[in-house]
Every structure is written in structure tokens, then in C-alpha cells.
């Protein structure tokens, strides 16, 4: 059952990321900021030619190689551990979805669409795929910690 559910969830997560970016591009002009939840979140449309949180600008070839490598490793690890813990499956699904969501932008547009601006903190503008990656890495750390504390060293 997991072999069916996980690809479906991955496709749905990528679709949500791509639809959110499409909506932003259609409804907000480049570099314009629109208040979404007052004093908490604004939406904007930025073109990010770098990595997550706009680091390493204009290094598309590097991000393409890194993304292909990370996504392939995550897929292989997921397939080998398909019966693993839910934390592990969630983390890898989020990492794969986030990596592919931004990869699609890079291939299609030459940049990644970023849109979420946190008004209450000075933080980089990011997108849904970046959120998947961040949450996925946190879940992976939890999965590895739980595995370590249970003495399960596969």
C-alpha cells in the first residue's frame, strides 16, 4: 500500500507547490508585496536564481546537479526502507517533493518562484517547496534520532 500512497502524495505535494507558484505569477506583479495575514505573512513574487532562501545566486548548473543527486539518493533510500518508520517516509517524501518542485521551476523558467514573506521576522522569502525541504530535513533528523535511540542501526 505504501508503494502506491507515497507516489500519490508526492505528486499532490508537487502539484500544490506548482499551483501556488502559478497563482502568484498570475496575480502578483514581480517584486510587489501584498498583505495576506496582517503583520504575519505577506505574499510577493520574486525570481530566485539561487538556492533555498536565495543563497548562491546564478549557479543553476550546480543546483541542477545537487538536486538530481539528492532526489535520486532520497528515492533509492525510500525504496529500500519503504517499510520504515512514518517519520522516515514523511521526511523523504517531503524532501523529494520539495526538491522536484524547485527543480521543475529551474528547468521550466530558469529560476525558482518565491512568494512567502514573514512580516514578523527578518527572514528570507521562500516558497512551498522550500517549506517541504525544511520540514523534511527536520523530520529526517527526528527519524534518525528515534532510530538511534531505539538501537535500530539499519
Swiss-Prot record:
The keyword Transmembrane applies. This is Lipoprotein signal peptidase. It is a multi-pass membrane protein. Its EC number is 3.4.23.36. It comes from Streptococcus agalactiae serotype Ia (strain ATCC 27591 / A909 / CDC SS700). The chain crosses the membrane at residues 4-24, 62-82, 84-104, 125-145. GO terms for biological process: proteolysis. Its main location: membrane. The active site is at 114, 130. InterPro entries: Peptidase_A8 (IPR001872). It is an enzyme of class 3 (hydrolase). It is found in: Cell membrane.
